[in-house]
Regions:
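A short beta-loop-alpha structural element at the N-terminal edge
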Residues: 38-53
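Conserved beta-hairpin
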Residues: 89-101
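A short, internal acetyl-CoA/4′-phosphopantetheine-binding micro-motif in the GNAT/acyltransferase core
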Residues: 115-122
């Protein structure tokens, strides 16, 4: 609904961060938990550059090694296209003011276009929180993604299934997938 689109969508959660102190022999002395306040919120025009930087740096680190030069260039052209970026909705996972992860969808939230978490924050539940937020705030019964080969296990863990075999378009390798609510 139009009214629903105007409201500010946010979701907060608490995440525990664990630090283990050990002596010189490796014996655990104590465990310290630090609770971090995390928030998912819409990324606006003033924050989009940070989101694109996070996407690009994470892509270069984890996905580009599996792509041809043409594929890397195609992805770069995609994320640098102001016309394309204007058609997408970007949501960020923030710890205070630090952007730790991004999920971007088409306007109707039926298709995931980008889904990245900074390397040092992966495997901490940030991607899951972004996904949960999208799933809860999409009116679509089916959400699709063209997953990179690197991210297939992540999407499977989130409940997506493959809808076809690996495809290649403009040097970009992907596996079409879908999630049914």
């Amino acid at each position: 609904s139009a009214a629903g689109d105007r409201k500010v969508l946010r979701k907060e959660w608490l995440q525990k961060k664990l630090a283990i102190l050990c002596d010189r022999k490796g014996t655990v002395i104590t465990k310290i938990y630090e609770v971090l306040s995390m928030e998912v919120k819409k990324i606006d025009d003033t924050q989009i550059t940070n989101a694109i930087d996070l996407i690009w740096q994470t892509f270069l680190q984890f996905e580009a090694p599996d792509y041809s030069e043409e594929g890397v260039k195609s992805f770069q052209d995609f994320i640098e296209s102001k016309e394309i970026i204007k058609t997408l909705e970007f949501w960020g996972a923030y710890d205070e003011e630090e952007l730790k992860g991004v999920i971007a969808t088409n306007e109707n939230r039926k298709h995931i276009c980008c889904f990245f978490v900074k390397a040092q924050y992966q495997r901490q539940g940030i991607g899951r929180k972004l996904w949960d937020f999208l799933r809860e705030n999409s009116s679509s019964k089916t959400i699709t993604v063209n997953s990179s080969p690197y991210a297939v296990p992540v999407y499977h863990k989130l409940g997506f299934i493959d809808t076809d075999t690996e495809q290649l378009s403009d040097g970009i390798r992907y596996i079409p997938m879908k999630f049914e609510k």
